[in-house]
Amino acid sequence: MHENFDKRLELLLEGLSLTRRFLFDPEEKETELKNLEQLSIQDSFWDDVSRAGRISEKIARLKQQLLEYNELKNKINSIKFFLEDEESSKDLEIQKELEKEFIFCEKKIAEWETLRLLAGELDRNSCFLSINAGAGGTESCDWVEMLFRMYSRWANSHGWKVEVIDRLDGEVAGIKHITLKLIGEYAYGYAKAESGVHRLVRISPFDSNAKRHTSFASVEVFPEIDDKIEVEIRPGDIRIDTYRSSGAGGQHVNVTDSAVRITHFPTGIVVSCQSERSQIQNREACMNMLRARIYQKLLQERLEKQNTNRKEKKEISWGSQIRNYVFQPYTLVKDVRTGYEVGNIQAMMDGELLDAFIKAYLADYGEIT
């Protein structure tokens, strides 16, 4: 037991060292925090509410990161202290407590090692996630709603805020199309692994003959970008349409034409938003999404040229099938890109196992710092 603990401690110390070296320099973060706190106490701080909000969020994030880092460092030092003490290391009760501390520290180190794979230009950003029903009619619409639930639960487990930007319900049940905004650090870095077609195989609850059906839903993920990134959108290249916001069952939740749809002719990209209170706000949200999608398209084209000799030759296209979810005659979720699979489909649909699939993807395709 003691020998096993020694080896695990060695790995934890190595992981902590790599974290300091490549991901999180606590001294650097402390300096950044102090500088931002000095800004926040200036009389003019709230003159620019948007900027003040971003700085306040950054301060809170830095405080949380430093808290987590120091907690981990203290736990590892505590483990080291008890293992070096001959009497304590032989105590069974202390060994049980050490095991709990090891599990906590190993999990945290694993999370931070995953962040090392998120070195893309926009990986740290919030993101938009759109789910669209494919072939399969009502069954596919129900599949979209199931994926919406899975992603919402998964995002909440990461502490991200989930906003519904646009939604179109199915004629009988489910959802034809939905766009979410996942607000939080590294939301795009994680969620980008989900872009592609998701295939469902099950006995349909909408079929009185209880036949097995195959349905499809496509997921598209694109990062939120700030005003520092310039994306040219000429007025003549877009068409702006307005319509009434609608809720479940097609019932109008707003009697004015406040929802906005923007079509970008050069790329064929269409974005829509009905979540805001006014047409002006929805139009602004649409333009932000359009800028993000155009920028992502440009990035993707650039990466495709750069990656001709890299691992990405495995051909991951945005429209390709990436994962199968089989409910009957057996239960299995399998990622066709990595080969990773699990049998507990209910835990998967509850959002509890999605991280394992994403980490497998990042191990193959992520950019390492």
From Swiss-Prot:
GO MF terms held by the record: translation release factor activity, codon specific
Positions of modified residues (N5-methylglutamine): 251
GO biological process entries: viral translational frameshifting
SMART domains according to UniProt: PCRF (SM00937)
Residues spanning the membrane: none
Location relative to the cell: Cytoplasm
Entry GO CC: cytoplasm
Metal-binding as UniProt keyword: no
Modifications the protein undergoes after translation, according to the UniProt entry: Methylated by PrmC. Methylation increases the termination efficiency of RF2.
SUPFAM superfamilies reported for this sequence: Release factor
Keyword vocabulary terms for this entry: Cytoplasm, Methylation, Protein biosynthesis
Superkingdom field: Bacteria
Family as reported in the entry's similarity comment: Belongs to the prokaryotic/mitochondrial release factor family.
Biological role stated in the UniProt entry: Peptide chain release factor 2 directs the termination of translation in response to the peptide chain termination codons UGA and UAA.
Miscellaneous comment text of the record: The gene for this protein contains a UGA in-frame termination codon after Leu-23; a naturally occurring frameshift enables complete translation of RF-2. This provides a mechanism for the protein to regulate its own production.
Protein name in the entry: Peptide chain release factor 2
Organism: Chlamydia muridarum (strain MoPn / Nigg)
